[in-house]
Amino acid sequence: MRMTFSLGLVGAGQFSGQFSTLFQAHPGVRDVYVTDLLPERAERLAAAQGLAGTFPSYEAMLESPAVDAVAIFTQRWTHGPLVVQGLAAGKHVYSAVPMAITVDEMAAIIDAVRATGLTYMMGETSHYHPATVHARNQIAAGAFGRLFYAEGDYVHDMDLGFYDAYRYSGGENWKETASYPPLLYPTHAVGGVLGAWRTHAVSVSAIGVRDERGDGVFDRSVSRFDNDVSNATALFEVAGGGSFRTNEFRRVGYPSHIRESRFRFFGTEASMEQLATVALWQDKKGVEDISELLEPTPTLAPDDPSLAHIAPELRAAFTSGSAPVHDRSRLPREFDHLHNGHEGSHHFLVDDFVTAVTTRTLPPVNAWVAARYTLPGVIAHESARQGGVRLEIPDFGDAPEA
């Protein structure tokens, strides 16, 4: 008989409701509970989806023997301490991105995983994006030749849904946290590059652009993070030779709702480039349009009632399903007709975490990989604050074999 486990959702915001449906449907998950700082949100989600119950606090959830694992869907700067707290309480942990926002927080997570032997996984969507999957396959086949350069963009304008999202999560003082530094949210760009190119960043130089909107967001006098930068670019050196560049843009004339993360890879024999609606494979003989191979199929109508609390500009991220390049054969059949999201990644994220817990194996985006997706942005942020000075990026090494 297959092992099953129970799961507690931490946070009942815009994201967790989409994932609770998938966790409940997975044959490896027995019961799903939820807690939120606003109890009415937890009660509303539990009632809407028929969850097993609610807890009055995260601490109460961790103390309960009814919960074997937790999935953290809280504000992005809160993850590090919550993850360590969960592992220390004996729970397996799935966490939304980013892993953490300081080097010390990441080190603490890795130490806790090593000490407890419990599962930790960061839910990085771009690891499963069609472009990343295709590039990963082509790299494995040697089609690029020697890969020497790549680019990853996370281009999401604040006007396209982010104001509503920050108001929803931040309450009346939402502007304090809407100024969250772009480079401290690096994984949708870095993860798509390093999810295909098996290397890691060793140094970085980054430049930030000060915001000029003047609406109290990205205002250092208001910002909890002392941040006035809304757009930033980072150039990374990688181990073994080569480089990659990322863009983190929050004020940009670009249709973020069509494709907010996009990637490009360049090798000595071939290259691949992705834009909002077009993707190309190129070699020394010519160009092949691979757009259809990487195009996700919608799994939910944008006006579905389950998306009513999500800004219209953000709904595409919660409806985009698998692309032809995805191999769905390993997914549970229970997912076949369920909503997906973020270019088909949600089904794979849930299945990889559940599989890791039930088989006691390392998930693809384990603590060591998560650090390599997150830490480059933390150091890049510091480089930008120092005017672009080149800084070395520490590394926690490869994940253990078992």
Where are the regions a protein language model picked out?
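C-terminal helix-rich "cap/oligomerization" subdomain common to oxidoreductases
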Residues: 1, 9, 69-71, 283, ...
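N-terminal Rossmann-like dinucleotide-binding module
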Residues: 1-49
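Short, Asp-centered acidic motifs that coordinate Mg2+ and/or phosphate
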Residues: 33, 53, 69, 149
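Conserved SAM-binding strand-loop segment of SAM-dependent methyltransferases
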Residues: 51-58
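Beta-strand-loop-alpha-helix segment that lines the small-molecule cofactor/substrate pocket
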Residues: 64, 68-69, 75-76, 80-128, ...
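Glycine-centered short loops/turns at secondary-structure junctions
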Residues: 90, 117, 142, 241, ...
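Predominantly a Rossmann-like dinucleotide-binding segment in NAD(P)-dependent oxidoreductases
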Residues: 119, 126-227, 232
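Contiguous beta-strand/loop segments that form the cofactor/metal-binding neighborhood of enzyme cores
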Residues: 184-306, 346-363, 377-381, 395-402
